[in-house]
Amino acid sequence: MLRALRGAADLLSTALYKNEMMMSRRYLSTPAPEPAKPSSEETTESTEPATSVEDAGEPMKEKRITQPYSSEALTKLKLDQYPLYVEREWWKTGKRMTFWASWRQLRDVKRREQIQEVGADRMRLKAIKFNTILPQAIRDEAAEKMQKARKYDHPRLILNMCQFTGRQRGKIKPYRLSRHLFRRFADRSALSGVQRAMW
């Protein structure tokens, strides 16, 4: 019984491994070239009414050519020419492999982006709320808008962690480093404008 179970487990693990290998293979895709449009003479000769995809009520989908990730595919799709790289959305948002020291750092980045969106409006609403010259109705409306704001719109929730370690406390703010790394880099002259104290 145990041998049969062990054999089944081996078969299952090899099947899963092959499936993972197939899924891990990366592909490049590009829209298929558009077919050549028929000339005006050919269209007048044909008597059959041509129904387009839009008339049929079905959504029109682009056909994409999928190729394995290789140097030939890069050359064929002209991705090795200027610009030399394709900037992708996941790269813009900072989701690069091993880029953030910890998941807390990525959370901090998201909060910074959120405050960048609403920071100016929040500052104006706060000024209206605490302005004693304005009528009370306007001040109450500003206070209500601030109350209904999203959870992480408050700038005090931004931690500005150390960029190397993700440490939240003991930071040297202009260099965005924790005190331990600041001292280590300063000792070997790896920070611009910092010299080891000598007396």
Curated annotation (Swiss-Prot):
Keyword Cytoplasm annotated: no
Region (Disordered): 28-67
Record-linked Gene3D superfamilies: 1.10.287.1480
Places the protein is found: Mitochondrion
GO molecular function, one term: structural constituent of ribosome
Main localization of the protein described in the UniProt heading: mitochondrion
Name under which the protein is recorded: Small ribosomal subunit protein uS14m
Species this chain originates from: Caenorhabditis elegans
Gene name as annotated: mrps-14
